[in-house]
Design a protein with these regions (language model features):
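Transmembrane alpha-helix interface/packing and boundary motifs in multi-pass membrane proteins
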Residues: 16-25, 102-111, 143-154, 326-333, ...
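Alpha-helical transmembrane segments of multi-pass membrane proteins
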Residues: 10, 93-105, 131-148, 179, ...
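Membrane-embedded alpha-helical segments and adjacent helix-loop junctions characteristic
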Residues: 33-36, 40-130, 190-195, 199, ...
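Hydrophobic transmembrane alpha-helices of multi-pass small-molecule transporters
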Residues: 1-62, 66, 196, 200, ...
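Juxtamembrane and boundary regions of transmembrane helices in multi-pass small-molecule transporters
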Residues: 1-2, 129-141, 148-221, 274, ...
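Interfacial segments of multi-pass membrane proteins
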Residues: 37-42, 165-171, 357-358, 447, ...
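Generic detector of multi-pass transmembrane helix bundles and their immediately adjacent loops
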Residues: 401-402, 406-487, 491, 495-504, ...
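Loop-to-transmembrane alpha-helix initiation sites
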Residues: 7-8, 49-59, 176-188, 456-457
Length: 518
């Protein structure tokens, strides 16, 4: 029988999912609203509501944002992709064979978003120069970063979120490369799939419908600029007519590209959305100010906005990154606890040290560090911990887990593992990966407890399924970015992404129980 608290939690979860699907607000505010609802009804205590804001996993994500910026500002990423891109005439498969493995490797250790933000404009300009459709490379770029992120603890924020929940539940967390035991097989299979099928399944280039016909392209200080709306753009969900773009940014919106459609007429009534490509009429100051920010990703502007730094700075940034990874890996070894008692040499420790060194050596502008952190993602993560706790406190997690078991003809853990993968993956395609993990984690705990088996296979499945956002552009931020840059339609993601989702599912449900037995 449902209690009053269960009804409130169910209504809160239904409202949360609905608001996320309809994009009513930013995800962080939606999840925060739900946690406040649970607080008001006594389902969460103030301490339980705020625990996520001090969780190591959440703070580590914030530190990795800054570390990614430090590596990006050094110019190392731009130099890497330029060396990988063939300058002579080539084929799509040959170019992808050079790019995708390296991109996956990089994204295993850096936040996926800055990797895509740096690589996508460079790849687009290169594709135009060698006369190959850029649309053949941009979705594979996003997918390669997602696949790489599955291979390490720090590869994606979802892995750190689940790891934080595991530690809070009293279990041993993931090692740095533990997820790679299954992630590397998925990444290799995914890259092979992209090499053989992406050229056939992805569209040819879609030409722009608006360009120099405005008669303004001859001005010396103004340029036709294409800018993809990022997560920190303040006008998301506001109408163009209500948001004074000229006053905010000194540029005029001429066109909006969305899901393969160019919007020119009645622009004032159109609402801005994350991932939209804006065709702007802007001057040099706009390019210099917003060329390196999380507000926009600048594309066709006639100027190179890639960060530039000396060779020594590039090598120093990469050395710090390698030392952080090695330190966190060695810190997991048993003898380190005896060598340095009282010091927890985990990923958080080394990320914090690396961030401080990067700040004081000016690898990123320390005075402006707040603009490089995606606060909405952090609030989403922090509130995800509270929502997961509310599902456990109210008994909702047990009710849902019991229902899943009852609906399954076979009570085998293998079958229920597959069911959990499908549920988590559907949520991540419709809402966000971190919110999906928040909903799935208490289910994993309840399922394992009711079956009397190890929860670790279920935890790993959540990490993989919540990251495997291939079939829609809305489940993962990098998909939204390349959708705007490549002018893709929603169906483009379904056509190439759905088989990759199925491939990931098959590999996961076969290998995970073998590597992490029940």
């Amino acid at each position: 029988m449902l209690t009053f608290e269960m009804i409130i939690v169910f209504l809160g979860l239904i409202g949360m999912v609905t608001a996320l699907v309809l994009d009513k607000m930013r995800p962080g505010m939606i999840l925060f609203s739900v946690t406040v609802l649970f607080l008001c009804f006594g389902i969460l205590t103030p301490k339980e509501m705020l625990e996520g804001f001090s969780n190591k996993g959440m703070i580590t994500v914030a530190l990795l944002f800054l570390i990614s910026v430090g590596v990006r500002q050094s110019g190392a990423l731009g130099q890497l992709i330029k060396k990988l891109l063939p300058q002579e005439k080539t084929t799509v498969m040959k170019a992808q064979a050079r790019m995708l493995p390296a991109i996956s490797f990089v994204s295993a250790f850096l936040n996926n978003t800055p990797v895509v933000v740096i690589f996508a404009p460079i790849i687009k300009r290169w594709a135009e120069s060698v006369r190959i459709p850029a649309t053949k490379f941009l979705i594979p770029l996003s997918y390669a970063t997602i696949l790489g992120g599955m291979c390490t603890l720090i590869g994606t924020s979802t892995n750190l979120v689940v790891d934080g929940m595991i530690l809070d539940a009293g279990y041993k967390g993931f090692g740095m490369f533990e997820l790679g035991r299954v992630g590397i097989f998925i990444a290799l299979a995914g890259i092979v799939y992209l090499l053989f099928f992406s050229s056939r399944l992805l569209p040819e280039v879609r030409k722009d419908t608006v360009g120099d016909e405005h008669g303004e392209a001859d001005a010396s200080s103004f340029h036709r600029v294409e800018a993809v709306i990022g997560a920190r753009f303040p006008g998301i969900n506001k109408r163009v007519g209500d948001f004074n773009f000229v006053r905010h940014y000194g540029a005029e919106v001429k066109e909006i590209k969305r899901s393969g459609v160019s919007i020119v007429d009645n622009l004032s009534r159109v609402k801005f959305r994350e991932g939209d490509t804006l065709v702007l009429w802007a001057d040099d100051s706009f390019i210099s100010t917003w060329g390196d920010s999380s507000v926009f990703v600048l594309l066709a502007n006639g100027k190179d906005t890639e960060p530039k730094a000396g060779r020594k700075k590039r090598w120093f940034a990469l050395t710090l990154l390698v030392l952080m990874i090695v330190g966190a890996t060695v810190g997991e070894l048993p003898f380190m606890e005896e060598l340095l008692p009282g010091i927890d040499l985990d990923m958080f420790f080394f990320a914090a040290v690396t961030t401080v060194i990067m700040a004081w050596t000016k690898l990123f502008p320390a005075r402006k560090y707040t603009k490089y952190i995606s606060w909405d993602i952090l609030i989403t993560i922090a509130c995800a911990f509270a929502i997961s706790r509310a599902m456990v406190n109210s008994g909702v997690a047990d009710i849902i887990a019991h229902g899943i078991i009852d609906m399954s003809d076979d009570y085998s853990p293998h079958v229920l593992l597959a069911v959990l993968f499908i549920i988590t993956n559907l949520f991540t395609e419709l809402i966000t990966n971190n919110a999906a993990a928040a909903l799935a984690f208490p289910l994993a705990l309840s399922l394992s407890n009711q079956l009397g088996v190890s929860p670790m296979p279920f935890f790993v499945v959540i990490c993989i399924a919540a990251s495997a956002s291939f079939s829609t552009p809305i489940g993962y931020q990098t998909n939204l970015i390349v959708q705007g840059i490549g002018n893709y339609k929603f169906t483009d993601f379904v056509r190439i992404g759905l088989p990759l989702n199925i491939l990931t599912f098959i590999i996961s449900v076969i290998l995970i129980p073998l590597i992490w037995p029940f």
